[in-house]
């Protein structure tokens, strides 16, 4: 749908949405986002120009349906997919993409580290995707040197970053905030460095005793991103991997650097969002969100979870959705889903579904809490359907209609029960929603109460 939109921009030195927004131009992508968000187009332009909102939209991803990530827009959810050396293949990843989009993923990250030709997998995902696609280029950089981290050069990183941009990737996680002087700060941690990309760069710095090449070559990356309108997703290499490590000196030192890099990218009109933790106790979530806004000048915050406890392997879509809902309420713009397989293995299709629904709940709850326009409309419609025993309408309005119908039909499968005024929980005689109080009866009762004392017993 964007082929004609981007045709006139090709060949220009800077084609970012932020660049046009700062020139006072409302692009077709901004207009599309305004309609999706039910917000004025000029507000979208202002938020993009200010850096509080991004529209990840690589000019080479022409089948993209533009969306926004920012505090003024609805809270978004990202789903991670990706093949590994031990599991999955191209078709499985495209199937996961389609499943993620079906269940409401607003963006999808391809985190493939193996399982076939990474370029073919990525290209297939981009070509099939109506939502923005993100990647972590350092993974393919490592694959290009056959896993020998010490052999990586700055040019290796830049080559892969530009390749992803050319292929149509809308945002890239760039681990430029972890500096060599930050590494001693992880000494007191239980889980050290838990970011895959951050771990790769830490090992490179420890071997070479040189500064992070993504930091020293950040200007070169900016120039690449300007030409394709790739958004930065500044990686939090030192995010806490357990609640013990949350909000420590290592995390906050990197966050300060991420703020500096954000403003450097903005000087060139390149869009930025900033990634965040991780594992954070509930009482520290508000601090983390506000600290990010302060250090990063209100660039959109994109958090993984956070998990609020570490003791529930197999249920971390729940431990993290609790933290995600709180983070969204405090102003986080996008939540990266966590599946039940987190810390245990590569998620399958059912894990993707469960993780996504948990996070759609968290994001929607945050939208309601922040009083975003129209956020509660669907809740009210479903509640009316529930009160009227309109079972099919309830299923239709559910985040996961198939699961809602499946659970209802487990005990009452016959079609006749789709019009019944009860479910199997209370049965036909005890459902409280059968108590329909007539408006006229209430009016008469009010008149009675106004003039007669209530008889006890």
From Swiss-Prot:
Give the EC number(s) under which this enzyme is classified: 4.1.99.17
Q: Which GO terms describe its cellular component?
A: cytosol
The UniProt keyword set, sorted, is: 4Fe-4S, Iron, Iron-sulfur, Lyase, Metal-binding, S-adenosyl-L-methionine, Thiamine biosynthesis, Zinc
* GO annotation, biological process: thiamine biosynthetic process; thiamine diphosphate biosynthetic process
Any one Gene Ontology molecular-function term assigned to this protein's record: carbon-carbon lyase activity
Biological or metabolic pathway of the protein:
Cofactor biosynthesis; thiamine diphosphate biosynthesis
Cofactor section: [4Fe-4S] cluster
InterPro entries linked: ThiC, ThiC/Bza_core_dom, ThiC/BzaA/B
Cofactor note as given: Binds 1 [4Fe-4S] cluster per subunit. The cluster is coordinated with 3 cysteines and an exchangeable S-adenosyl-L-methionine.
Q: Record's Pfam families?
A: ThiC_Rad_SAM
What does the entry list as the binding residues for [4Fe-4S] cluster? 423, 426, 431
Query: Per its UniProt entry, what is the enzyme's top EC class, as one word?
Result: lyase
Q: Which reaction does it catalyse?
A: 5-amino-1-(5-phospho-beta-D-ribosyl)imidazole + S-adenosyl-L-methionine = 4-amino-2-methyl-5-(phosphooxymethyl)pyrimidine + CO + 5'-deoxyadenosine + formate + L-methionine + 3 H(+)
Superkingdom of the source species: Bacteria
Q: Which residues does the record give as substrate binding sites?
A: 80, 109, 139, 175, 195-197, 236-239, 275, 302
Binding site residues for Zn(2+): 279, 343
| Stated family | Belongs to the ThiC family.
| Role description | Catalyzes the synthesis of the hydroxymethylpyrimidine phosphate (HMP-P) moiety of thiamine from aminoimidazole ribotide (AIR) in a radical S-adenosyl-L-methionine (SAM)-dependent reaction.
This chain belongs to the protein called: Phosphomethylpyrimidine synthase
Q: Which organism is it from?
A: Nostoc sp. (strain PCC 7120 / SAG 25.82 / UTEX 2576)
